Swiss-Prot record:
InterPro entries reported in the protein's UniProt record: Band_7 (IPR001107), FloA (IPR022853)
Species per Swiss-Prot/TrEMBL record: Priestia megaterium (strain DSM 319 / IMG 1521)
Entry protein name: Flotillin-like protein FloA
Description of how the protein assembles with itself and partners: Homooligomerizes.
NCBIfam families: PRK13665.1
Similarity field: Belongs to the flotillin-like FloA family.
Keywords per UniProt: Cell membrane, Membrane, Transmembrane, Transmembrane helix
Location(s) in or outside the cell: Cell membrane; Membrane raft
Entry-linked Pfam families: FloA (PF12127)
Induction data: Expressed during sporulation stages IV/V, part of an operon with downstream gene BMD_4542.
Protein's membrane topology: Multi-pass membrane protein
């Protein structure tokens, strides 16, 4: 009796393990849900997904939604997109939204957009409801030197045919900013821009800025416009300051050259004085030699001494008169 009980429990345990393994590899509830929704899927197909490491619910549930929406999508297409790393549920939702909005979008196109890293569902929604992109303040300078700042609102619609390989929102903002700057810069007076800001949007819109992008520009509206700095006056002030600094540098250079020349002349004067002193020191020797050789007499020597004394006296009187005049 005990052996029979043990055998019974062993059989029950093996049966439970077998059922657990069976339900792990065979998603019966998912298969029943698909049958209830009218989607015919072989149970062996679901088992094959398990073996290929595909989560069956990630493929079957979107297939049920696509079938209910009337889309002719096969399970092989969805599984292939899943194995490629795509978001199956998002692609199916985008196809359903495009089908409801009468937008032509095939599964291959939607899968390619999804694998390219674009949000295909958002693209379909933007095709139905255009998106508004607001730019920051963009500054341009008119010909009169006044800075004008403008903020624009760009209404764009997604172009599904150009989503793969097309430029994004940053390119749209950059191109519109470039158009605003060039339009403001072409005006002779900033007042014309303030009086007619619509001129900016019309000029920019006519340049075909959406070429090569994933969007179609519907409208460009100037949301705000403001006056900035007087760039012309600032540039003139900077130029005047630079000219002043250059003039000061040149004046300082000339002053330094004058000081150097003055010092050089003083050095030359001292050099000449030294030569004079040196020459004066040789005069007594020359006179002694002249007296010794008989070239001059004693009376001649006395006359020279008298002339020297008279000269010294006149120099002294001249210096005294000069000092009195200065006082």
């Amino acid at each position: 009796m005990e052996v029979g009980s043990v055998l019974f429990f062993v059989v029950i345990g093996l049966a439970i393990i077998a059922l657990a393994v069976f339900f792990t590899f065979v998603p019966i509830m998912l298969w029943i849900s698909a049958l209830a929704a009218g989607v015919r899927i072989s149970i062996f197909t679901l088992v094959g997904m398990r073996l290929r490491r595909v989560i069956p619910s990630r493929v079957v549930n979107p297939l049920i939604k696509a079938s209910k929406a009337g889309l002719g999508i096969t399970i092989n297409q969805l599984e292939s997109h899943y194995l490629a790393g795509g978001n199956v549920d998002r692609v199916v939702n985008a196809l359903i939204a495009a089908h409801r909005a009468n937008i032509e979008l095939t599964f291959e196109r939607g899968a390619a957009i999804d694998l390219a890293g674009r949000d295909v569902l958002e693209a379909v929604q933007m095709s139905v409801n255009p998106k508004v992109i607001e730019t920051p303040f963009i500054a341009g300078v008119a010909m009169d030197g006044i800075e004008v700042k403008a903020k624009a609102r760009i209404t764009v619609r997604a172009n599904i045919d150009r989503l793969v390989g097309g430029a994004g929102e940053e390119t749209i903002i950059a191109r519109v900013g470039e158009g605003i700057v060039s339009t403001i810069g072409s005006q002779t007076d900033h007042k014309k821009v303030l009086e007619n800001p619509d001129m900016i949007s019309q000029t920019v819109l006519g340049k075909g800025l959406d070429s090569g992008t994933a969007f179609e520009i519907l409208s460009i509206d100037i949301a705000d416009i403001d006056i900035g700095k007087n760039i012309g006056a600032v540039l003139q002030t900077d130029q005047a300051e630079a000219d002043k600094n250059i003039a000061q540098a040149k004046a300082e250079e000339r002053r330094a050259m004058a000081v150097a020349q003055e010092q050089e002349m003083r050095a030359k004067v001292e050099e000449m004085r030294a030569k004079v002193v040196e020459a004066e020191a040789e005069v007594p020797l020359a006179m002694a030699e002249a007296l010794r050789s008989g070239n001059i007499g004693v009376m001649d020597y006395m006359n020279i001494q008298n002339l020297t004394a008279d000269t010294d006296m006149r120099d002294s009187i001249g210096k005294m008169s000069k000092e009195d005049d200065e006082k």
